[in-house]
């Protein structure tokens, strides 16, 4: 099986799931799969592999958390014991997922059920789709090319003047395969080093963090703030409601706010002095990262907060050269973190699949994001999107 542990996912799934257990245990949601570059040159069809994908999901749904895995989670300062107890009896249920081959040669994946019981599907299902696709289309993968490309990245990061630059692995969902993912991480650990003096800050993957002694990284994803559109008191206040609910859960811990659910301008309107002080920083995931960083720093200054005490996290389609450019622009002006995904874990010379699974409904109503990159928006209800734009004053 591709997925052999329920920890083989991103940390933010657990940090969000804990909020769901404590604050929104009754929420019902629906997620939908999309391949953003389907039909593009070099991208094959997924429909031929639909039975294999279903088989792997069946295997995923037979997994339980092991005692050592639960102990690892329990040792994290922000994970509460009642949540670990819940995970001790948890398993994913296949009835909440359907995978269908479409006449176009694409596939439809729908995940629908209680948020608490469906939140852990997204990352392993994406990793399954990716690995099934690549093991069928690249039966003899060019690992030599992959290693060469990784070596180039490492040498770029070790150039003069970049000693303080740290990167993190955010590549679970779109990795070429699990074995390759582990090799990449082991190589980075050996070559870049970890801890205070190393250049590898950690990984979003909880299983590999546990296995390799790395720091697991992550706070919140778009789905959390999107669900708040249906769970909060008023749509206009849903972003504030999301941040306040997060703060109620974590009391200042895990303080990185995601900034692009309604675009940067709406984020800055809501992210007032209170949130500037309370949260440790913000994460960039769409739009121009240089412009975003400058606006973020100016916003801190305007709210009488020293930007040097705050962290800017960049995680949008990063490559090593782009990471270095951003580091050079913002070094010394704030704390910095860089999460590199596909470019680390799926760069062997083959065209990667740009696949996502996004929440589209919560408690029966549409939810959406209006990110700073229009192609990243995903909602089936045009009327709702128009309403959202109006409410958040987006042009």
Curated annotation (Swiss-Prot):
Q: What class of enzyme is it?
A: ligase
Say if the entry is tagged with keyword Oxidoreductase.
no
Biological process terms from the Gene Ontology for this record are: NAD biosynthetic process via the salvage pathway
Q: Do you know which InterPro entries this protein is assigned to?
A: N/Namide_PRibTrfase (IPR041525), NAPRTase_N (IPR040727), Nic_PRibTrfase (IPR006406), Nic_PRibTrfase-Fam (IPR007229), Nicotinate_pribotase-like_C (IPR036068)
Q: Which Pfam families match?
A: NAPRTase (PF04095), NAPRTase_N (PF17767)
**Can you name one GO molecular function term for this protein?**
nicotinate phosphoribosyltransferase activity
Which superkingdom does the taxonomy of this entry point to? Answer: Bacteria
PTM note says:
Transiently phosphorylated on a His residue during the reaction cycle. Phosphorylation strongly increases the affinity for substrates and increases the rate of nicotinate D-ribonucleotide production. Dephosphorylation regenerates the low-affinity form of the enzyme, leading to product release.
Which protein family is named in the record? Belongs to the NAPRTase family.
What task does this protein carry out? Answer: Catalyzes the synthesis of beta-nicotinate D-ribonucleotide from nicotinate and 5-phospho-D-ribose 1-phosphate at the expense of ATP.
Q: What is this protein called?
A: Nicotinate phosphoribosyltransferase
